[in-house]
Amino acid sequence: MVSVNLEAKKTVDVMIEKQDELNIAVSQLSNGATIIDCGVNVDGSFKAGELYTKVCLGGLADVGISIPGDLSEKFALPSVKIKTDSPAISTLGSQKAGWSVSVGDFFALGSGPARAICKKPAETYEEIGYEDTEADLAILTLEADVLPGEDVAQYIADECNVDVKDVYLLVAPTSSLVGSIQISGRVVENGTYKMLEAIKFDVTKVKHAAGIAPIAPIDPDGLKAMGKTNDAVLFGGRTYYYVESDENDDIADVAAKLPSSAADGYGKPFFDVFKEAEFDFYKIDKGMFAPAEVVINDLTTGKIYKEGYVNVDLLKKSFGVDN
């Protein structure tokens, strides 16, 4: 079976080779681990955001950036485009922020291929029937405001049972260009996550997927940046899923439940919802983490289902746009 770490390494190699033109910084820790700073002490770039997102997806997706004019006649934003023919593995088996990395004073949400080696969390990999058993290296992306040290790299190496010199850690804060891009790049993953976690649908039946979401404006306030980046998907994300159903599946019901607008807490910017939940993710309805608009093509029946909608008014409210 394909190795998400070995596939992602191809993109990591490009980032290392082109670090200057990408406005990123590559360094090596004293224990040999490689750190790729994509936004902590550097500016990053659009292209760095594309490549970072592709690494998150285990190299199993095409990632691009464009400015579509159809989000709204009066409101166009640079947007991230995702296409994948391995949706379950690329999004849930790699991209999902499923590893809370806590070592000493360092904490970050970990995404990316290394999760598939040590199966974090194990339930996800049981559900999708995947594990990366081929890799002799570990690649993890970290959403953090500071760069990790030797102790963090050693922890990752130990968890993945690889030599620390074969650990690659990519870092971008939420309040950076690359950070904003990679969160919008989770537009497809938000849908597969909700299918699995909230709707309990077998995501291995999703054979192909595509999505697009606007890139949230960069905010130096980390909490506000987190709100805006989530809203980019919740209110502006559009996704397309190609599903191979069986006779027991109610795809119309899956489609109806999938958009963010189907969640109980829908209707406010995410920062407001998060604040009301006392900044505790676990108090927020899981159904909130979903794209705004969903189209499902049932490959078995030929039927197509469209649910949800782009909410430009809430997107503008979140981003602070007055007109």
Swiss-Prot record:
Q: Which UniProt keywords apply?
A: Cytoplasm, Hydrolase, Methanogenesis, One-carbon metabolism
InterPro entries from the UniProt entry: METHMP_CycHdrlase
Per its UniProt record, what Pfam families does this chain match? MCH (PF02289)
Q: Any one Gene Ontology biological process term?
A: methanogenesis, from carbon dioxide
GO molecular function annotation? methenyltetrahydromethanopterin cyclohydrolase activity
Known EC number:
3.5.4.27
Pathway in which the depicted protein is active: One-carbon metabolism; methanogenesis from CO(2); 5,10-methenyl-5,6,7,8-tetrahydromethanopterin from CO(2): step 3/3
Compartments reported by the entry: Cytoplasm
Q: GO cellular component annotations, sorted alphabetically?
A: cytoplasm
Q: For this protein, what reaction is catalysed?
A: 5,10-methenyl-5,6,7,8-tetrahydromethanopterin + H2O = N(5)-formyl-5,6,7,8-tetrahydromethanopterin + H(+)
Q: Note the superkingdom of the native organism.
A: Archaea
Indicate the family of this protein. Belongs to the MCH family.
Kindly give the NCBIfam families that the UniProt entry links to this protein: one_C_mch
Query: What does this chain do?
Result: Catalyzes the reversible interconversion of 5-formyl-H(4)MPT to methenyl-H(4)MPT(+).
> What is the protein name stated in its UniProt record?
Methenyltetrahydromethanopterin cyclohydrolase
- Which species does this protein come from? Methanobrevibacter smithii (strain ATCC 35061 / DSM 861 / OCM 144 / PS)
Gene encoding it?
mch
